[in-house]
Regions:
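Binding-site signature for planar aromatic cofactors or substrates
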Residues: 1-166
């Protein structure tokens, strides 16, 4: 098992002879800390998608949005965002309460098209200093990127997806 791949990934990579390119992509795409470009991309985002799963592994994918800067990089390997009551179902945050693993996908389709993935472990709290500085938020979510590959990122033209679709 590696930062990006588990046994299931590896079996399919071997079956379709893509292990070498997969290893190269992992080498090129994983980081031990957010770069200045990662930070600028994240903090300029007006939305992102968040993937969570409940304790039984049932997945959920949600949209989170706000003004630029609503997501902040708070440490070399951490970001934080406020949660606003949308529909009151608490699907994502409820899942995080029982399974802290999270995937986030930031996409910019405008001036400089690109995307950035962050996989990590989240905490959800009402006892965070950012809450007082965030009007209307109920909770703060902090995500610590996982392992030594803190951020898994790609910022390239959307048309260039041949090797980075997974």
């Amino acid at each position: 098992m590696t930062i990006m791949y588990h046994d299931g990934n590896r079996r399919l990579q071997d079956q379709f002879d893509s292990r070498r390119i997969s290893d190269r992509l992992e080498e090129k795409l994983t980081r031990t800390a957010f770069t200045a470009d990662d930070r600028a991309f994240i903090e300029s985002a007006i939305y992102f998608f968040i993937a969570t799963a409940d304790a039984d592994g049932r997945p959920d994918c949600s949209f989170k949005g706000g003004a630029p800067g609503f997501v902040r990089v708070t440490a070399p390997d951490e970001l934080a965002f406020p949660d606003y009551d949308g529909n009151g179902m608490f699907k994502s945050l409820g899942n995080l309460a029982v399974n802290a693993h999270v995937g986030m996908l930031f996409i910019d389709l405008h001036e400089k098209p690109g995307r950035l993935r962050v996989n990590g472990v989240a905490t959800v709290t009402r006892e965070d200093p950012l809450l007082a500085a965030t009007v209307g938020a109920q909770l703060i979510v902090r995500v610590t990127a996982r392992g030594t590959a803190v951020a898994t990122a790609v910022t390239s033209a959307l048309g260039d997806t041949s090797a980075i679709c997974g």
